[in-house]
Amino acid sequence: MQNIHFIGIGGIGISALARFLKEKGFKISGSDLKESKITKELEKEGVKVSIPHHKDNILNKDLVIYSAAIKEENPEFKYAKELGIKCLSRKEALPLILEDKRVFAVAGAHGKSTTSSILASLLDDASVIIGAILKEFGSNMIYKESQNLIFEADESDSSFLNSNPYLAIVTNAEAEHLDHYGNEVSKLHHAYAEFLDTAKIRVINAEDEFLKNYKNESIKLYPSKDIKNCTMCIENFKPFTSFELKDLGEFKIFGMGYHLALDASLAILAALNFLDIETIGARLKNYQGIKKRFDILHADENLVLIDDYGHHPTEIKATLSAAQEYAKLGGYKKITAIFEPHRYTRLAVNLKEFAKAFEGVDELVILPVYAAGEEPIEIDLKAVFPKALFVENIQREGKFLVASKGQVFEEGLIIGFGAGDISNKLRQKNE
């Protein structure tokens, strides 16, 4: 049995790979800087997790796989190199993990986790590796004795080019992570085209500025004309979205927002290659959403508290539109957004767009930037958001939120945005 060690095993994407290889019969261990909910869960599942990194953790290992966050000076990485242990980045390890599978890969700047998770509900015989927790299964990985595997493919480091897709879905090709592509949009778009070209079956959002010009044969979704009568409702505080897709009939899915109808439509069009429409409609009802995507943590007549992973203006704008609809349907008079900016570079490049994205809220609370390992950039956020409340911290107390300055947030619709630490701040310790 091969011993595989993961450096940075607490990451949402890398932990899914570790879980998958464990189910395949490999002996898995890992390490991370600090303990987290994911590392605790992995230990319960029988994975030896060491906190923090130490060079001895890689002794007697046959292979080391490391996350994108790991630098060359990491003690485990350095020692593994000295000992001649094979070291693969997550990107380099993908062919090893996916080589014997028929891969249904989902890529795009926004919506790939949601589209992947909906596809997982529809193609319920497939294994799943995604960068989010599926509420239906309580994990970011599902292992099935099947040739089929649904994979959330990442464009940020071009690792999606190593996913060998049989079926490829691209939700959109908006410019994100341009630093990896030499700040050239054309290089990013070339990578998306290469990803699609590799697949036998391609499903695309044909109204995306880049994808609308994709020349090879593909199944095309034109959202503005193919998605009709999109409506939302709340049942016992749970959100649902109904819509008609092409001439395929009406569909209803857990969650809220036009963007959800778009993601679901792409998943449905992909699944139609393997299932009849009646089966798809029935299985869509099993979908329970994913953690951190319009994730309702508490709801009563006076207060609804929502956690969302949105960290780019496009995502925030779409989710706030859904939040406004939820507030209207639920009779909540006030919308408060709590924003933890993620990465200085993203914030600096999109400052004006972030300001526009939050225009519809009644109150905006801004937390310190979550650097994600970046060097700080001087940004005058108070000039960009003159009406915002800036606080050092916020924490959950019962069903309410309390800021470091003493303000209590206890009514209306409160929604937190960010890909850093905000999710932990919004949740009770056991959530």
Swiss-Prot record:
One BP term from GO: regulation of cell shape
Keyword flag Coiled coil: no
Pathway: Cell wall biogenesis; peptidoglycan biosynthesis
Protein name from the UniProt record: UDP-N-acetylmuramate--L-alanine ligase
EC number: 6.3.2.8
Main location: cytoplasm
Entry GO MF terms: ATP binding; UDP-N-acetylmuramate-L-alanine ligase activity
UniProt catalytic activity: UDP-N-acetyl-alpha-D-muramate + L-alanine + ATP = UDP-N-acetyl-alpha-D-muramoyl-L-alanine + ADP + phosphate + H(+)
Family affiliation: Belongs to the MurCDEF family.
Subcellular location as annotated: Cytoplasm
Taxonomy, superkingdom: Bacteria
UniProt cross-references to PANTHER family, sorted A to Z: UDP-N-ACETYLMURAMATE--L-ALANINE LIGASE, UDP-N-ACETYLMURAMATE--L-ALANINE LIGASE-RELATED
InterPro entries xref list: Mur-like_cat_sf, Mur_ligase_C, Mur_ligase_C_dom_sf, Mur_ligase_cen, Mur_ligase_N, MurCDEF_pg_biosynth, UDP-N-AcMur_Ala_ligase_MurC
Pfam families xref list: Mur_ligase, Mur_ligase_C, Mur_ligase_M
Annotated binding of ATP, by residue: G108, A109, H110, G111, K112, S113, T114
Source species: Campylobacter jejuni subsp. doylei (strain ATCC BAA-1458 / RM4099 / 269.97)
Known function: Cell wall formation.
Highest classification ranks of the organism: Bacteria, Pseudomonadati, Campylobacterota, Epsilonproteobacteria, Campylobacterales
Keyword entries, A-Z: ATP-binding, Cell cycle, Cell division, Cell shape, Cell wall biogenesis/degradation, Cytoplasm, Ligase, Nucleotide-binding, Peptidoglycan synthesis
